[in-house]
């Protein structure tokens, strides 16, 4: 069965660019927060830009969280969180106050210790593979992705970190726990490497 992707719509500004990428790759994608679209999808993508607390407020208001937890945590539907969509997987975020996250991957989101580097972290950076990751299959040495953020995921366990990046200090670029994947960078802005990463996600 060909993958059918639901890009979860909670008012994030980059849902259309992610949807355009899915279409460009030749797959069926729908931007939606409707239960039928979520249950009928084979894969779920949660894009995200902006602050942790604001994202969580919109997610709680606009997405059926009980259904999502059933689909993702119980039924193990493949899930990809992008940028803020990765960060909200944490237990708590500390951006403009302390805010509860989804708590799907234990950890916290804290401000980058940039050690003199300019914030926000904007631009291309090479990521460093730490553990085998199906998202990076076939990418070889081309591990250059586009980042835009000032906060980073600090997981409770380092076992979920599949790749990291250095910008002042080292922090996770890709995390994974079972069917849950998160990327701090924007694959939809990362040209061929980003396209290949999403292509690798869709057969999972």
Give, region by region, the residue ranges found by the protein language model.
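Extreme N-terminal starter segment of soluble prokaryotic enzymes
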Residues: 2-6
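Short acidic low-complexity segments
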Residues: 28-40
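Amide-donor transfer/coupling interface in amidating biosynthetic enzymes
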Residues: 73-74, 107-204
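Cysteine-nucleophile active-site neighborhood
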Residues: 50-122
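Structural signature of beta-strand start/N-cap positions in the alpha/beta core
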Residues: 28, 43, 78-80, 144
């Amino acid at each position: 069965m060909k993958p059918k992707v639901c890009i979860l719509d909670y008012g994030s500004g980059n849902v259309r660019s992610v949807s355009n990428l899915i279409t460009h790759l030749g797959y069926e994608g729908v931007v939606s927060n409707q239960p039928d679209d979520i249950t009928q999808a084979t894969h779920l993508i949660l894009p995200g830009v902006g602050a942790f607390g604001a994202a969580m407020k919109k997610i709680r208001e606009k997405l059926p969280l009980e259904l999502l937890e059933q689909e993702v945590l119980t039924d193990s539907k493949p899930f990809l969180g992008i940028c803020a969509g990765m960060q909200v997987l944490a237990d708590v975020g500390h951006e403009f106050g302390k805010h509860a996250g989804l708590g799907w991957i234990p950890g916290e989101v804290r401000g980058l210790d940039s050690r003199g580097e300019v914030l926000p972290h904007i631009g291309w950076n090479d990521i460093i593979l730490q553990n085998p990751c199906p998202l990076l299959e076939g990418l070889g040495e081309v591990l250059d992705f586009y980042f835009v953020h000032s906060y980073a995921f600090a997981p409770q366990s380092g076992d979920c970190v599949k790749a990291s990046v250095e910008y002042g200090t080292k922090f996770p670029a890709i995390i994974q726990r079972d069917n849950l994947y998160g990327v701090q960078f924007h694959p939809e802005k990362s040209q061929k490497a980003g396209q290949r990463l999403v292509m690798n996600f869709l057969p999972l």
